[in-house]
């Protein structure tokens, strides 16, 4: 017969194992978006029915930055692929080898690879070898520190563009997140206005590279 102390230790161990398994088994949360894009800068107007899978470790802020990045670059579906391509979200945090957003032409070639956040230089270099163009959107308060530490390592990557989304704007984007969203995106003079009919967020990204 187990002593009271041994029984309690076994109970704690069982609880820890169960909690760990439950955490590992957490599934991505699915978000549905109807995104109406009016890109005045590039004369691109289209509705996109999108599905976002938010990884358990991904914040609403990061997820909405992915959505904003797609809106900024949706016109390339027409300009780069003549409408015959696939603009879609990748596995994101579920697979570090997969882009957050990508544009693939009808041959399966990656025309555009988009990452958000503050990745290391090696994954960025790999992305530049896999796609014609790579766009990186950073948004956190620590972005300036990250950029100072990585800028010189990215200088040689001609296919790469790096954009800084103001943190206040990215935080405001998070408040638009709903499991089902009807959003309007207007792009003019390089800026994005994203709204749901009640609230609108203005995004004026700054190009760092």
Locate predicted features:
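Acidic-basic catalytic patches of nuclease active cores, encompassing PD-(D/E)XK
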Residues: 41-93
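Conserved catalytic cores of phosphodiester-cleaving nucleases, focusing on short active-site segments
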Residues: 101-103, 110-124
């Amino acid at each position: 017969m187990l002593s009271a102390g041994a029984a309690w230790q076994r109970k704690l161990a069982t609880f820890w194992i169960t909690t760990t398994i439950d955490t590992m088994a957490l599934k991505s949360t699915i978000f549905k978006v109807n995104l109406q894009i009016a890109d005045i800068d590039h004369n691109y107007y289209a509705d996109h029915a999108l599905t976002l899978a938010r990884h358990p470790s991904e914040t609403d802020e990061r997820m909405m930055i992915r959505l904003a990045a797609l809106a900024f670059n949706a016109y390339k579906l027409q300009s780069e692929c003549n409408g015959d391509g696939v603009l879609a979200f990748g596995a994101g945090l579920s697979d570090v080898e997969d882009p957050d957003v990508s544009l693939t032409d009808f041959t399966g070639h990656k025309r555009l690879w988009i990452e958000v956040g503050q990745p290391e230089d090696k994954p960025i270099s790999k992305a530049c070898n896999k796609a014609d163009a790579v766009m990186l959107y950073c948004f956190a308060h620590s972005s300036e520190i990250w950029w100072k530490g990585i800028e010189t390592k990215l200088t040689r990557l001609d296919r790469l563009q790096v954009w800084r989304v103001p943190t206040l704007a990215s935080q405001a984007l998070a408040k638009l997140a709903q499991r089902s969203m009807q959003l309007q995106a207007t792009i003019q003079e390089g800026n994005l206005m994203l709204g749901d009919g009640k609230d609108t967020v203005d995004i004026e990204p700054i190009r760092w590279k």
